[in-house]
Design a protein with these regions (language model features):
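Exported/periplasmic ABC-transporter solute-binding proteins
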Residues: 20-70, 74-81, 90, 94-98, ...
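Bacterial N-terminal signal peptides
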Residues: 5-16
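Phosphate-/polyanion-interacting regions in eukaryotic proteins
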Residues: 86
């Protein structure tokens, strides 16, 4: 009788220990909502991070702002499950204020700058000065820009300040929910403007370069844990990794400028 009870107890203890040990199937899957400007960085980080830490990353494209249903604020407003958001810092601040993202977890990850692209094989015009950029804008038959941070700045601030004339407004178009580079690659716009990190992954275009410093606007890309995340510790660990020196190469390769780590 005692032998039977001992065996039973041993089996129960063994089962309990086995159940407590994590298995590959139990590895958490983090849903990451990423805007285009930092998408290249998280895509570059993902393979090594998943292999090293056993965490699966489900990365979904989602603009930082705009009317499209896929935009991060609209997804969270609908209650879509997510763990991490990677997006334009100013747009993230509003999510923090609205209680959709955790303030304590918010961290800046990289700086981005606006660049111009043409269809692959087309001549690359000079845009090194504001005068050259203005002439290119006047001469181009069609101009495309995004509906996110860079496009809002271009359409509301830079272009109006350049005295481009009424005709310019008829040939300049804001592109929603699609990378500007793809529109240029299809030949639907002669030139396109977007964050360098958003243009770099697009096939079928040539990047002319950054617009001049006098007309440039830096955009900070940041990240935070979603307020209702079910994997808060794992989500925070991913953000800590992306803000560390280990991720610098991946961030720089994507077209963003990594931040000094003394500032973190």
């Amino acid at each position: 009788m005692l032998k039977t009870l001992s065996c039973t107890a041993l089996l129960v203890a063994t089962f309990a220990c086995s159940a407590a040990e994590p298995t590959p199937d139990q590895a958490p899957t983090l849903t990451v909502l990423s805007s285009g400007g930092i998408m290249g960085a998280i895509r570059n980080v993902a393979p090594a991070y998943e292999h090293t830490y056993g965490v699966k990353l489900n990365v979904l494209a989602a603009p930082s702002m705009g009317q499209t249903p896929q935009a991060i604020p609209n997804r969270l407003q609908r209650g879509e499950p997510a763990d991490v958001v990677l997006m334009v810092g100013s747009a993230l601040d509003k999510l923090v204020t609205d209680g959709k993202a955790d303030k304590a977890s918010r961290i800046d990850l990289g700086k981005s700058f606006i660049a111009m692209a043409v269809r692959k094989g087309e001549p690359k015009p000079a845009i090194g000065t504001m005068g050259e950029l203005r002439q290119v804008l006047l001469d181009s038959p069609s101009v495309a820009y995004s509906d996110s941070a860079s496009g809002v700045y271009l359409s509301k601030t830079l272009f109006p300040s350049m005295n481009l004339g009424e005709g310019f407004t008829h040939k300049a178009h804001m592109i929603p929910a699609e990378p500007v580079g793809k529109v240029v690659a299809r030949g639907q716009a002669a030139i396109g403007f977007q964050q360098l990190s958003e243009l770099k992954p697009v096939a079928g275009i040539d990047i002319v370069g950054l617009i001049p410093a006098e007309g440039q606007k830096m955009t900070m890309y940041s990240g935070a844990v979603v307020a209702n995340s079910q994997h808060r510790a794992a989500a925070q660990a991913l953000l800590d990794y992306m803000a560390s020196a280990q991720a610098d190469a991946a961030i720089e390769k994507s077209g963003l400028n990594p931040l000094p780590h003394s500032a973190h």
